[in-house]
Amino acid sequence: MIKILYQNIKPEGWLRRQLEIQAAGLSGNLDKMWPDVRDSAWLGGDREGWERVPYWLDGFIPLAHLLDDADLLARANRYVHAIVDRQQADGWICPCAPDQRATYDLWAVLLIGKVLALHCEFVDDQQVEDALYRTMKNLHDLMAAGEVRLFDWGKFRWFEGLVALMHLYQRQPEDWMLALGRMLREQGADYAALTPLWQRPMNQWRQETHIVNLCMMLKYEALCCAFFGDEPTGVCEALWRELEEHHGTAVGTFTGDECLSGTSNTQGTELCAVVELMYTCEWCYAVTGDSIWAERLEKVAFNAMPATFTDDMWGHQYDQMVNQVACVEFPGRSHFRTNNGESHLFGLEPNYGCCTANMHQGWPKLALHAIQQTDDGLCVAHLLPVRAQTQVDGRDVAIRVETEYPFRMCAKITVDCFEGEAFTLKLRVPAWAKDVRLNGQKARVQQGSITLRKAWQGSESILLEMSAAPHFVRRPTGLKTVEFGTLVFSLPIETEYRMREYTRHGVERKFPYCDYELIPTSAWNYGFADASLIVEEHPVDAVPFSSKRPAVTVRAHLAPVEWPWEDGFDTVPAVKPASNVPCGDVRDMTLIPYGCAKLRMTEMLQLKEIKE
């Protein structure tokens, strides 16, 4: 298992700019203007006292440390210590009275435990370490006595408690920690037995098919292997393939609005599911070393993640759609299976506030996992612009990655080691990469990585170069998408942003944290006229996934086609066009990265069969 560098890794280049945008948007301001964080019961207030503040801190803490921003750091520390200061004498930490514990969903205990452990990874804070120990020991004692047990959310997210237990056990192993882990597993849901419920979508809300539960669930075996020492069985790989077959999307996620929704290109995927799927892939790669999890992570991170935010990250969606031609509130019944008709709007709290609280972990945790420490050296797991300092066998080592990946196919990696230390540097190479070269020479790639074992002396730089070709990918609908490297491309639709300012249930929406409907002002009904795909590079903008100035585009020949609306809706296209016969002239049009396109057509018909 690898080691995350936490306080010793810092972002640079486009990744730092993305994190700065995030800090200037909702993530860095929720505690100032959103009642469920600002006035939370976790701090003695009268608002929500369950998952929302812990969710926010789970992303806000690493964001503050990655940017090394004094104001953000002070606010994160203030929240953590306000929570710890309210811990009860027996160790119970959640904001509820003693006589309410039996009916308090223990998901919040597991979540705050994970957050306190994360804080302690960055800060040598004995008060919080002690509070975390007492929190988990209290949970053990209450569960062992039968005074509390897992139900509802806690039952379906039991494995999240292993994160805090692992943190404690690595520092001070005690038998009760393993015992608590076993109780969580025994009382938790058995996901392998639930697959018959995943075969087809149902317009019914239930925990067993809840998309966020399932995206979290896919790491449970990795966590069990890391904590209990279990032998891997591949069960979560099998569960992934089951979900992918019946509910997979073109951008590596699964549909769920809010429960499993099939392979339709107009069903939604919840933002919480996006960030939790990223976190799952990070854990699975860290524990297994299997590159497929890193591939999956990048597909989600560089496509689904940026697509569901406004460029300034003040607004987000609850649900995103692969073919998304309008984000307008449905006047009658919702198109989504259990979510309401405003779930695809961009704003402060569309549909429900869980994503407002939980969206913050995506970019920061990706940055933390870019460079990882292994038993015999270092691993560049993701070609992201970062620098890190650590020790290998007691000797100081610095490493820096300079790159504009995923918009470019090259990276410069510099290692500084002035004591002549021999160690292994592993460079993960994406599975799609062709003609992989190191310093101009053809590189040997084995099991998805280049492995360099040598004595590093002074400052040494490596130039890693890759190539890729844009290509079509066939979807279950029979339509095609375009991919280039890890990026999926879409036809952007010209958009009018219609601002909505209002107050609902005591929560004010006003600029910049207002809501937006997105109105299409150009046609969207096109198909691919031939196989021509030409990649064009552009400067990487100050907004890396800019909707106005994308860093890479693909020119394609498209033709208009008769494409009706979904029955009962006039802002949702049917899954497929009515015909494969063009109804107009072929046009040279520009596709942009899916993550840059807020209104878009991604799955389109190939109007002429092409041999691939």
Residue ranges and their predicted role:
Residues 223-246, 265-314, 324-325:
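Catalytic-core region of carbohydrate-active enzymes that cleave or remodel glycosidic bonds
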Residues 37-53, 94-112, 144-158, 190-219, ...:
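Solvent-exposed loop and edge beta-strand segments that line ligand/cofactor-binding
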